[in-house]
Amino acid sequence: MIDPNLLRNNLAEVAEKLKVKRNFMLDTEKLTALEDQRKNLQVTTENLQAERNARSKAIGAAKARGEDIAPLLAEMDDMGNQLTEAKAQLDAVLAEINQIALSIPNLPADEVPLGKDDTENKEILRWGTPRTFDFEVKDHITLGEEANGLDFAAGAKLAGARFAVMKGQIAKMHRALAQFMLDLHTEQHGYLETYVPYLVNHATLYGTGQLPKFGEDLFHTLALEGEQPYALIPTAEVPVTNLVRDVIIDEAELPIKMTAHTPCFRSEAGSYGRDTRGLIRMHQFDKVEMVQIVDPDKSMEALEELTGHAEKVLQLLNLPYRKVLLCTGDMGFGSCKTYDLEVWVPAQNTYREISSCSNMWDFQARRMQARCKAKGDKKTRLVHTLNGSGLAVGRTLVAVLENYQNADGSITVPEELRPYMGGLDVIGK
C-alpha cells in the first residue's frame, strides 16, 4: 500500500506515474469525491462529539441544580443517534478508500527502466559460459525419466496436470539442493532458518499483497465449522514477512534476515499453455526463500546484498546465469525494484528465471503496520521489506540435470552437492 498522504496531497502526480509506469488507471474523480466525503464526515463527527460532550457537562450541572433534565436527555439521545449514523457513514467511506488503496501497485524506483513487458528488461551482467556439448542434449524430462527419478504420469494420476513424483537419486538431489541452499544462507549469509505454516489466514495474505488483487492465483480451503478460511502459501515470503506484522522493532535489531524452505502452491491462472511439460511451472514446487526486514534508509543496499546471496548459489553450483533489472511493466505488484536471475537451460537454449529478488520499500510494511523505533525516540517509522528466491529448488534441479548431463545419459553431481548425497559423484545410468 502506498503512502495515503501521497494520494491526498499529490493525487494527480501519483495517478500520472501509475499510468505511465504501471499502466494502472487510478480513478481520481472517485477518490477525490470519497476524500471530500471523508473530510466532511470527519468534521461532522468531531463537531457532534464535541457538542455531545458539552451537553453532557450541562446536564450534570442542571441536575446538580435540581432542574428537570428530561428534555436535555432527549436531545442527547437524538445527538447520539446522529453521531452513530455519522460514524457509520465515515467508516463506510474509509473502507471504500481502503479498498481502492489496496488495489494500487507500488510506485517503481526512479532507476527502474520504463517498459511494457519482459522484452524491455535491462540485462545487468552474465556469469559463466554455457557449456558446449559434443552430443545431442537431452531435456530434464528425458534425463529424469531415464534415471527412473521423474514420474509425471504418476503425478497426473495422483493430482492432475502440473504435478510430478520424484524418486531415488533424483529425489535425493532435490533434497540435497534445498539443504545446500539453507546451509549457505544460514552459515555464510547470516539468515535465521525459520519453519512456518503452509496454510495462512487472509490477514497474512493482505499483509504481503496477495489479497485482495490476486486471490485467483491461490489455492483456497473451505472454512471448517468454527474456523476461518485458509489459503496455501504461494511462497514462504508470505508467512515469513508477516512475522513482523503489528510489531515495533528496536532499530538496533535491524536488519532481520530469515530464510525458509517450503513447498509453494500456485494455481498458475493465466499460464494456460505455457511450460505444460516438465518441472518449470508446477502447481506445487519447493523454494528456499530469503526475507530481510531493514532500516528504511538501507533497503537499496540490502537489495544488492540479497541478490548477491542468490547469485552465490548459482556460482557455487557453476551454473551460468544472467542478472536482469525488471522494467516497470514486468515488475510484481508490490515491488519498487526487482532483479531476476535467469539460469541457462541447455535443452531450451535460453535463460529461464530461477530467482526474483525484490525491494518492496514500505509497501508491505504499511499493510502490516511493521515499524521500527530508535532507542529513546517516541516516533516510529515503517520498516522496509525485501524478499528473494534463494533458489527455486525444482528449477535448480532442472538446471543441474541439463548442464551436468553426460553422453550416456548419466548426470555428474556438482561438487558442492556430493557431501549431501553420500559422496555420490554420478547419478542416473
Curated annotation (Swiss-Prot):
Alphabetically sorted, this entry's keywords are: Aminoacyl-tRNA synthetase, ATP-binding, Cytoplasm, Ligase, Nucleotide-binding, Protein biosynthesis
**InterPro entries linked:** aa-tRNA-synt_IIb (IPR002314), aa-tRNA-synth_II (IPR006195), aa-tRNA-synth_II/BPL/LPL (IPR045864), Ser-tRNA-ligase_type_1 (IPR002317), Ser-tRNA-synth_1_N (IPR015866), SerRS_1_N_sf (IPR042103), SerRS_core (IPR033729), tRNA-bd_arm (IPR010978)
Tell me which domain of life the UniProt entry assigns to the organism this sequence originates from.
Bacteria
Annotated pathway, please?
Aminoacyl-tRNA biosynthesis; selenocysteinyl-tRNA(Sec) biosynthesis; L-seryl-tRNA(Sec) from L-serine and tRNA(Sec): step 1/1
Signal sequence range: none
PANTHER family recorded? SERINE--TRNA LIGASE (PTHR43697:SF1), SERYL-TRNA SYNTHETASE (PTHR43697)
Please state what the annotation says regarding this protein's domains.
Answer: Consists of two distinct domains, a catalytic core and a N-terminal extension that is involved in tRNA binding.
What protein name applies here? Serine--tRNA ligase
Organism field: Haemophilus influenzae (strain ATCC 51907 / DSM 11121 / KW20 / Rd)
